[in-house]
Amino acid sequence: MLFGESMTLKIAVVGAGPAGRTSAMFLAKNGFDVDLFEKDRVGGTCLNYGCTYITGLREMADIINNLSILKGEKVHLEEIISFKELQEKINKIQDRIRNKLEKETKELGVNIKYKEFKNKHKNDYDYIIYATGRNYPSNYNGYEVLTHKDIPNLRELPENILIIGGGVVATEYASIFSDFGCNVVLYTRSKILKEIKDEEIRDYLMKKVINFKIINDKEELENLLKDESYTKILAIGGNGRFKTDDYLRVLNEEKVYACGDCLINGGGNTPISRMEGRVVAQNIYNEINNKPLIKPNYELIPKTIRLSLTISYVGKQTNNYKTIRSCVGKGNFFKVLSGVGINKIYYEDGKIVGAITMMPCAEILPYFTQLIRGIDVYNNFMEVHPSTDIFYKEFRS
């Protein structure tokens, strides 16, 4: 058990996304009386509008890409399934996941309240944890736009799409809808995917992976915003709601914490949100028991961008690197005919400090991250074959 003896304190967690649910479950599991407030649906942005939903779209796009490679010509989504049918099937899967999340949350003793948490509720609780997500604009320069919450409700596939933003979500949407057969234009003020700094990797992405038009000109953007034939999607980062100290305590508040995307100075993706949720749960216990508080650790966070190739990266990108050939297996077999990407492991002062990969099995990157931390996960390593894992051959003892 994380906390030891059960507690009788009453705690409100506001928001049932990855951060809030993680905090609530950890606290309830260890004896706290926890009410989890959710005004929408369990799962937060991740399940309902973000990474999980986009995974469904991406998997369909990968099917289309493989068929296009095999046929030697572009296959469009509507030749296989209507966009309306695809959306409905994804929604059914989301419902199943949502029901599972709700069940496991309640089984741990969390009381889920499907209503808005209001100021009048504050006096009913000893501690409050906010995990409410970001605020997102609903218009851009006065023009109505779709946001991440609108896209799952679309039932007709747009012919022309303008996407505003240059980050991971914007790029993933642009890639998916282009794979579906839409004419996609992405506007970004500078360049896309800024965290990828390796110029050789960027050059490969632009030539081999990016399948949509990118513009930077404001006048061209304005013309497209005025063009009624374009569906406009705004995919820029929203704004956090709460500023906290290093221990995720909300500033100028007593016994109030915050975690996840609602942080002005934190959040970022689902694993980070969960980690912050765990830190908040631990710190509430520590505060009660006069123990030192802990800080969230934002070092060496693995990240993934799912385009026609999956790009994953962690750590530093330096000028001292080794290029590793891709391995062929589940997820990239037919891509051998069109390109399976490049991979690099980066070094500094003789030590491994990072990597960028284009392998389908992005899930193995956290194990490589442990190697950067000095934990030899590849000692006596036995692989599954065939595998697209590029690391084990390089580092197995």
Swiss-Prot record:
InterPro entries the record matches: Class-I_Pyr_Nuc-Dis_Oxidored (IPR050151), FAD/NAD-bd_sf (IPR036188), FAD/NAD-binding_dom (IPR023753)
GO aspect biological process, one term: 2-oxoglutarate metabolic process
Highest taxon of the lineage: Archaea
GO molecular function terms noted in the UniProt entry: dihydrolipoyl dehydrogenase (NADH) activity; flavin adenine dinucleotide binding
Signal peptide range in chain numbering: none
Matching PANTHER family: DIHYDROLIPOYL DEHYDROGENASE, MITOCHONDRIAL (PTHR22912:SF151), DISULFIDE OXIDOREDUCTASE (PTHR22912)
Protein name per Swiss-Prot or TrEMBL: Uncharacterized protein MJ0636
Organism name: Methanocaldococcus jannaschii (strain ATCC 43067 / DSM 2661 / JAL-1 / JCM 10045 / NBRC 100440)
